Amino acid sequence: MNLNATIFFQMLVFFVLGWFTMKFVWPPLTKAMDERRQKIADGLAAAEKGKADLAQAQARVSLIEASAKSENHARIIEAEKQAASLIEQARREAEAERARIVAQAAQDAAQEVQRARDALRDDVAALAVKGAEQILKREVDARAHAELLNQLKAQL
């Protein structure tokens, strides 16, 4: 009987310990495990959300990059058009200036030619008068007249 009473008390202590563990020890442990499980689940969800946010950010970056490339391309084309326009305008202005300078030079040359002709005419008239004067002062002689004409030619 002594053995039976020991087993009985051991069983009673075991059941009390089991009840005590189930009532007071086990709930905080399960609560701590559930909280830890929830933290892990929240962490995984946050990681998935972070991945999704990263994918969205990368998509936005690629859109912004494409937009910037197209905008830069448009700006480059516009700058090239503007440069071509400026070059063409400068070419037209230079051509107009060249035409004006050529016209002015032609006009100056024509005036100079006219002055030279007028001066030559005056010189020829003066020489003709001088020659006629010398011819009239001398007697009529073909050799003398030829000599005077040669002198006039030399003066021209």
From Swiss-Prot:
Disulfide bonds: none annotated. HAMAP family: ATP_synth_b_bprime. F-type ATPases have 2 components, F(1) - the catalytic core - and F(0) - the membrane proton channel. F(1) has five subunits: alpha(3), beta(3), gamma(1), delta(1), epsilon(1). F(0) has three main subunits: a(1), b(2) and c(10-14). The alpha and beta chains form an alternating ring which encloses part of the gamma chain. F(1) is attached to F(0) by a central stalk formed by the gamma and epsilon chains, while a peripheral stalk is formed by the delta and b chains. F(1)F(0) ATP synthase produces ATP from ADP in the presence of a proton or sodium gradient. F-type ATPases consist of two structural domains, F(1) containing the extramembraneous catalytic core and F(0) containing the membrane proton channel, linked together by a central stalk and a peripheral stalk. During catalysis, ATP synthesis in the catalytic domain of F(1) is coupled via a rotary mechanism of the central stalk subunits to proton translocation. NCBIfam families: ATP_synt_b, PRK05759.1-2. This is ATP synthase subunit b. Gene3D superfamilies: 6.10.250.1580. One of its GO terms (molecular function) is proton-transporting ATP synthase activity, rotational mechanism. Keywords: ATP synthesis, Cell inner membrane, Cell membrane, CF(0), Hydrogen ion transport, Ion transport, Membrane, Transmembrane, Transmembrane helix, Transport. It is found in: Cell inner membrane. It comes from the Bacteria. The chain crosses the membrane at residues 7-27.
